[in-house]
């Protein structure tokens, strides 16, 4: 997939989907034509944060043979959105061959999108890694907690050793300031490069903010909040 960004994390609960959604909208506000795909098949929730109620999902592609173009919804700022489907147990574990077929089927999106943002499942599953290895840029979301460090480390270990991925951008979420984000990143980077041939780049910090939490509750991305100037700059 060309011109594509995957947003990943070693564990759930670190704000991965929030960052993927707001990143997609920020890029669209900058004038790019953006598509957002929720690749957490069967357990998707990006549509909730977008305030979109999708009529179809990726299940219709995997199970019913519909082309990807037929399951696209239009979200805020005109972004194109592909839902991963929610509460659909029959697509929780997609076979590897089906994953590759799906990735190939996404290529037609290139004709009307400048960038594809993919929200991939948390953790180092085969599904996550298949998408991670197919995109141009891989963003890892990290928070300053030992469990997040360990799970992100495990994700990078698998991506690097099993899939040959070397370049990772790291976003540190829920920080008090940019200096704190830089410290957390440096500590994590030192732990990773000690053992793996990987390149980690600091992609910035996202502030801990009630406005972000309120936006989630309102089903409205924070970058669309006119009063959330600091939060907008972070994305």
Regions inferred by a protein language model and the residue ranges of each:
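NTP-binding/hydrolysis catalytic cores, primarily Walker-type P-loop NTPases
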Residues: 219-235
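G-domain G4 guanine-recognition motif of GTPases
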Residues: 10, 143, 168-182, 205-212
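Beta-strand-loop-alpha "switch" segments that mediate conformational coupling across diverse proteins
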Residues: 195-223
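Gly/Ala-rich phosphate-binding loop of Rossmann-like dinucleotide-binding domains
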Residues: 28, 132, 160
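Walker A/P-loop phosphate-binding motif and the immediately C-terminal alpha-helix
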Residues: 2-40
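P-loop/Walker-type NTP enzyme "switch/lid" segment
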Residues: 37-111, 216-220
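Conserved C-terminal guanine-recognition region of P-loop GTPase G domains, centered on the G4
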Residues: 149-163
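Inter-motif core of Ras-like GTPase G domains
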Residues: 108-111, 125-147
